[in-house]
C-alpha cells in the first residue's frame, strides 16, 4: 500500500499545514462602530508601525483619544506621530476612516466592510485599493481590484488611500531560502513537488523509467481518496 497523498495528510490538520496565526501581532480591524463615529469623529495617533508575519502589508498601532489602542492597516505615506480620524465628519485624506456614503466618487479606498461594524473584510493586501464608483439611495457601488463592481451599504466603513507595502513584488526572492521563510509564515506547503517526479509509493503518477502519468488523468468524483488526483470529475480535458 502506498503513502497518503498531500491532500489526505492536509486533512489531518498537523502543524505543517496549519496557518501559524500565533505569530501574528493581533486582530487587525476597525474600532467598534459607536455613536461617536456615527455623529462625529474620533481622533487617533499612530504610535508604532509593525511588521506582521504572514501579512503583505505593515500594520500600525493607533492610540485613540479615549485611550483605546488598535492595530490598523495603514496607507502609503503615513508615519509614526501622524493623526488619523474615524467617523462621519472625518476629513477626506489618506488614513482616515469614513462610511462609504460620505466618500466622494473616484476616491481610492481599502479595508472595506461588507456589513456595517464588521471591522473590514475587502481589499486588505499590500498595494491594493478599490474605487468608489457611484452613490444611490441606500447603496454605494465600489469597483474592487478584480474589476467587479460590488453594491454595498453606504454605512459600511472604508479607509481612504492605498494599502502600504505595494512594491513588495518588484523585488525578487533570489534565493530559495528567502522564499522558504516567506511562505513559512503562511499556511502554504512549499516547495510543491510534481506527482510524476515522485516515487510510485508516494503518488499515483510516480515511478517509471521516465516521467509520465501511465494512466488516465480523469478520475471519478466517487473514486477513492488515494487515487483522486488529476482532472477530478472533468467534463472535458
From Swiss-Prot:
GO terms for biological process: cytoplasmic translation. GO terms for cellular component: cytosolic large ribosomal subunit. It comes from Methanococcus vannielii. One of the primary rRNA binding proteins. Required for association of the 30S and 50S subunits to form the 70S ribosome, for tRNA binding and peptide bond formation. It has been suggested to have peptidyltransferase activity; this is somewhat controversial. Makes several contacts with the 16S rRNA in the 70S ribosome. SUPFAM superfamilies: Nucleic acid-binding proteins, Translation proteins SH3-like domain. This is Large ribosomal subunit protein uL2. Residues 1-11 have a biased composition (Polar residues). Residues 13-26, 228-237 have a biased composition (Basic residues). Belongs to the universal ribosomal protein uL2 family. HAMAP family: Ribosomal_uL2_A. It holds the Pfam family Ribosomal_L2_C. The keyword Transcription does not apply. The lineage of its organism: Archaea, Methanobacteriati, Methanobacteriota, Methanomada group, Methanococci. Residues 1-26, 204-237 are annotated as: Disordered. InterPro entries: NA-bd_OB-fold (IPR012340), Rib_uL2_dom2 (IPR014722), Ribosomal_uL2 (IPR002171), Ribosomal_uL2_arc_euk (IPR023672), Ribosomal_uL2_C (IPR022669), Ribosomal_uL2_CS (IPR022671), Ribosomal_uL2_dom3 (IPR014726), Ribosomal_uL2_RNA-bd_dom (IPR022666). GO terms for molecular function: rRNA binding; structural constituent of ribosome. Disulfide bonds: none annotated. The keyword Secreted does not apply. Keywords: Ribonucleoprotein, Ribosomal protein, RNA-binding, rRNA-binding. Part of the 50S ribosomal subunit. Forms a bridge to the 30S subunit in the 70S ribosome.
Amino acid at each position: 500500500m502506498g503513502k497518503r497523498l498531500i491532500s489526505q495528510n492536509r486533512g489531518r490538520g498537523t502543524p505543517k499545514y496549519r496557518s501559524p496565526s500565533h505569530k501574528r501581532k493581533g486582530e487587525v480591524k476597525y474600532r467598534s462602530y459607536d455613536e461617536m463615529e456615527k455623529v462625529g469623529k474620533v481622533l487617533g495617533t499612530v504610535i508604532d508601525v509593525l511588521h506582521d508575519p504572514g501579512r503583505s502589508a505593515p500594520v500600525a498601532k493607533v492610540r485613540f483619544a479615549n485611550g483605546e489602542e488598535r492595530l490598523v492597516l495603514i496607507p502609503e505615506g503615513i508615519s509614526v506621530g501622524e493623526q488619523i480620524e474615524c467617523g462621519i465628519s472625518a476629513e477626506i485624506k489618506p488614513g482616515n476612516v469614513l462610511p462609504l456614503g460620505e466618500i466622494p466618487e473616484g476616491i481610492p479606498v481599502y479595508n472595506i466592510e461588507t456589513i456595517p461594524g464588521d471591522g473590514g473584510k475587502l481589499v486588505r493586501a499590500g498595494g491594493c485599493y478599490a474605487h468608489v464608483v457611484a452613490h444611490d439611495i441606500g447603496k454605494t457601488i465600489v469597483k474592487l481590484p478584480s474589476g467587479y463592481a460590488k453594491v454595498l451599504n453606504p454605512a459600511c466603513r472604508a479607509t481612504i488611500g492605498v494599502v502600504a507595502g505595494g512594491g513588495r513584488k518588484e523585488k525578487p526572492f533570489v534565493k530559495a531560502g528567502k522564499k522558504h521563510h516567506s511562505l513559512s509564515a503562511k499556511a502554504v506547503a512549499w516547495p510543491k513537488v510534481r506527482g510524476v517526479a515522485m516515487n510510485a509509493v508516494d503518488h499515483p503518477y510516480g515511478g517509471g523509467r521516465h516521467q509520465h502519468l501511465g494512466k488516465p488523468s480523469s478520475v471519478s468524483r466517487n473514486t477513492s481518496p488515494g487515487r483522486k488526483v488529476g482532472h477530478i470529475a472533468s467534463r472535458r480535458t
